[in-house]
């Protein structure tokens, strides 16, 4: 019987095999800071490349953009982030620990087995009353003695230039979306795009989260993959459904187990005031269901706010009808770190083998696997031939070469990092110019001519 898949096992594997390390580890680390190791950076880069291909390159509606992290502070005034981008905080009067009130409520709902454990959109009064009525205790000391809720702004502030005063204050962006909105007219004009069209962007964002956690699920520094899709008012709900289905298929096509995914539509109470509809694709993490991908109908709120604040006209003139309007926006927003974690968790498996043996294997889809194949000489005496095989395919695929240890242990290591194929160079290779290819999932083996190796891998890794 398989053991339960736990976050402790995932974190241990991630560190030991070079997916993710604690940030600044030799100095005691930095809370909730993570560095991607050799395999982790390949995994995340593969996910980003595949997102870009599906959402920008392969979709005729969309183009790409890469905006600056540091922006004029007026952007954040107009967007409402400076005035309203905050978390509801409560302090425990006994142990002085600080918590997000909505997270205390959500954790309680999860413990009680609620199907939907969300407190999004709850007022401060509702949060406080719920905590009091349910006698929810401090997660740290177990006492029931909280302060009233107060708001805490999530933006990281710094200064630009040589002086540190109000005139030089700037902020690390808390989302990539606003850079797209302020460039709406630039992109539309220069690319000659007609509505409907979208602008995609991948980039870092920063939020001074009070209660980050669950490994790379919620961090203060993270990477977003966002699309802002501009459409004519009245067609927005049709496009909202289109992008929901598009996002869903992206995850399934890359092998995520459908049973671990669900849509959760936001209730009227949860919706931010400008949103017409919001739906999250949630993944069943070991710690519970968590948001993976948010798809929102933001209406014309963002463009109108920037038009009002900047004085720049954000209206679009339809060349077919001569109708002028501010486009509505559908936003599918995905965290690269969060979805990479979901792929890692979903791929993890502990298999019982014949004879009572066990192996850990990551069943990555070949397209997201960090290493596509490993070249393994059966003996160090075959290194020269094995390196020749490696050189024939390493320019086309991300290939690993390993000649250390028994062939069985090398197979197990490749299973554990999710390598789909192991290419064994044996003494027969010197005679027949063929290699043995072992499949990660079935552990079956086939003999393939070296001259046909590249074609074989191309057909398998697509």
Curated annotation (Swiss-Prot):
<feature type="binding site">
    <location>
        <begin position="335"/>
        <end position="338"/>
    </location>
    <ligand>
        <name>ATP</name>
    </ligand>
</feature>
<feature type="binding site">
    <location>
        <begin position="222"/>
        <end position="226"/>
    </location>
    <ligand>
        <name>substrate</name>
    </ligand>
</feature>
<feature type="binding site">
    <location>
        <position position="175"/>
    </location>
    <ligand>
        <name>substrate</name>
    </ligand>
</feature>
<feature type="binding site">
    <location>
        <begin position="331"/>
        <end position="335"/>
    </location>
    <ligand>
        <name>substrate</name>
    </ligand>
</feature>
<dbReference type="InterPro" id="IPR027031">
    <property type="entry name" value="Gly-tRNA_synthase/POLG2"/>
</dbReference>
<feature type="binding site">
    <location>
        <begin position="207"/>
        <end position="209"/>
    </location>
    <ligand>
        <name>ATP</name>
    </ligand>
</feature>
<keyword id="KW-0030">Aminoacyl-tRNA synthetase</keyword>
<dbReference type="Pfam" id="PF03129">
    <property type="entry name" value="HGTP_anticodon"/>
</dbReference>
<keyword id="KW-0963">Cytoplasm</keyword>
<comment type="function">
    <text>Catalyzes the attachment of glycine to tRNA(Gly).</text>
</comment>
<keyword id="KW-0067">ATP-binding</keyword>
<dbReference type="InterPro" id="IPR022961">
    <property type="entry name" value="Gly_tRNA_ligase_bac"/>
</dbReference>
<dbReference type="InterPro" id="IPR045864">
    <property type="entry name" value="aa-tRNA-synth_II/BPL/LPL"/>
</dbReference>
<dbReference type="GO" id="GO:0005737">
    <property type="term" value="C:cytoplasm"/>
</dbReference>
<feature type="binding site">
    <location>
        <begin position="217"/>
        <end position="222"/>
    </location>
    <ligand>
        <name>ATP</name>
    </ligand>
</feature>
<comment type="subunit">
    <text>Homodimer.</text>
</comment>
<protein>
    <recommendedName>
        <fullName>Glycine--tRNA ligase</fullName>
        <ecNumber>6.1.1.14</ecNumber>
    </recommendedName>
</protein>
<dbReference type="InterPro" id="IPR002315">
    <property type="entry name" value="tRNA-synt_gly"/>
</dbReference>
<dbReference type="GO" id="GO:0140096">
    <property type="term" value="F:catalytic activity, acting on a protein"/>
</dbReference>
<keyword id="KW-0436">Ligase</keyword>
<dbReference type="InterPro" id="IPR036621">
    <property type="entry name" value="Anticodon-bd_dom_sf"/>
</dbReference>
<dbReference type="GO" id="GO:0046983">
    <property type="term" value="F:protein dimerization activity"/>
</dbReference>
<feature type="binding site">
    <location>
        <begin position="291"/>
        <end position="292"/>
    </location>
    <ligand>
        <name>ATP</name>
    </ligand>
</feature>
<dbReference type="GO" id="GO:0005524">
    <property type="term" value="F:ATP binding"/>
</dbReference>
<dbReference type="GO" id="GO:0004820">
    <property type="term" value="F:glycine-tRNA ligase activity"/>
</dbReference>
<keyword id="KW-0547">Nucleotide-binding</keyword>
<dbReference type="InterPro" id="IPR033731">
    <property type="entry name" value="GlyRS-like_core"/>
</dbReference>
<dbReference type="Pfam" id="PF00587">
    <property type="entry name" value="tRNA-synt_2b"/>
</dbReference>
<dbReference type="InterPro" id="IPR004154">
    <property type="entry name" value="Anticodon-bd"/>
</dbReference>
<keyword id="KW-0648">Protein biosynthesis</keyword>
<comment type="similarity">
    <text>Belongs to the class-II aminoacyl-tRNA synthetase family.</text>
</comment>
<dbReference type="InterPro" id="IPR006195">
    <property type="entry name" value="aa-tRNA-synth_II"/>
</dbReference>
<feature type="binding site">
    <location>
        <position position="100"/>
    </location>
    <ligand>
        <name>substrate</name>
    </ligand>
</feature>
<dbReference type="GO" id="GO:0016740">
    <property type="term" value="F:transferase activity"/>
</dbReference>
<dbReference type="GO" id="GO:0006426">
    <property type="term" value="P:glycyl-tRNA aminoacylation"/>
</dbReference>
<dbReference type="InterPro" id="IPR002314">
    <property type="entry name" value="aa-tRNA-synt_IIb"/>
</dbReference>
């Amino acid at each position: 019987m398989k053991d339960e898949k736990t976050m402790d096992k995932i974190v241990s594997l991630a560190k030991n095999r070079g997916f993710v390390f604690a940030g600044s580890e030799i100095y005691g680390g930095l809370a909730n800071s993570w560095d991607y190791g050799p395999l982790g950076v390949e995994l995340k880069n593969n996910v980003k490349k595949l997102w870009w291909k599906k959402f920008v390159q392969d979709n005729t509606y969309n183009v790409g953009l890469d905006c600056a992290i540091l922006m004029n502070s007026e952007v954040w005034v107009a967007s409402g982030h400076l005035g309203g981008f905050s978390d509801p905080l409560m302090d425990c009067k006994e142990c002085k620990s600080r918590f997000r009130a909505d997270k205390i409520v959500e954790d309680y709902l999860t413990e009680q087995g609620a199907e939907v454990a969300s407190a999004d959109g709850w007022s401060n009064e509702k949060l406080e009353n719920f905590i009091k009525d349910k006698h929810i205790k401090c997660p740290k000391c177990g006492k029931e003695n909280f302060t009233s809720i107060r708001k805490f702004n999530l933006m990281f502030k710094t200064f630009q230039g040589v002086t540190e005063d109000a005139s030089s204050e700037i902020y690390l962006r808390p989302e990539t979306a606003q850079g797209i909105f302020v460039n709406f007219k630039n992109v539309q004009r220069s690319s000659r795009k007609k509505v409907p069209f979208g602008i995609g962007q991948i980039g870092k964002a920063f939020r001074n989260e009070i209660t980050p956690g669950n490994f790379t699920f919620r961090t203060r520094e993270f990477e977003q993959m966002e699309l802002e899709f501009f459409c004519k008012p009245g067609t927005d709900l049709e496009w909202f459904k289109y992008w929901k289905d598009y996002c869903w298929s992206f995850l399934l096509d890359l092998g995520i187990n459908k049973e671990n995914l669900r849509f959760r539509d936001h209730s009227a109470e949860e919706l931010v005031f400008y949103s017409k509809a919001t739906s999250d694709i949630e993944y069943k993490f070991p710690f519970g269901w968590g948001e993976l991908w948010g798809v929102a109908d933001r209406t014309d709120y963002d463009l109108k706010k920037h038009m009002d604040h900047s004085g720049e006209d954000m209206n679009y003139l339809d060349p077919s009808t001569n109708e002028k309007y501010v486009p509505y926006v559908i936003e599918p927003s995905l965290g690269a770190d969060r979805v990479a974690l979901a792929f890692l968790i979903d791929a993890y498996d502990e298999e019982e083998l014949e004879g009572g043996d066990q192996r850990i294997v990551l069943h990555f889809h070949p397209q997201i696997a960090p290493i596509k194949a490993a070249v393994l000489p059966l003996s160090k005496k075959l290194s020269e031939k094995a390196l020749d095989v490696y050189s024939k395919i390493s320019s086309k695929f991300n290939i690993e070469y390993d000649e250390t240890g028994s062939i069985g242990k090398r197979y197990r290591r490749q299973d554990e990092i999710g390598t789909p194929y192991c290419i064994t160079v044996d003494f027969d290779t010197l005679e027949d110019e063929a290699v043995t290819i072992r499949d990660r999932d079935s552990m079956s083996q086939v003999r393939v001519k070296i001259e046909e190796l590249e074609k074989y891998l191309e057909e398998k890794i697509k």
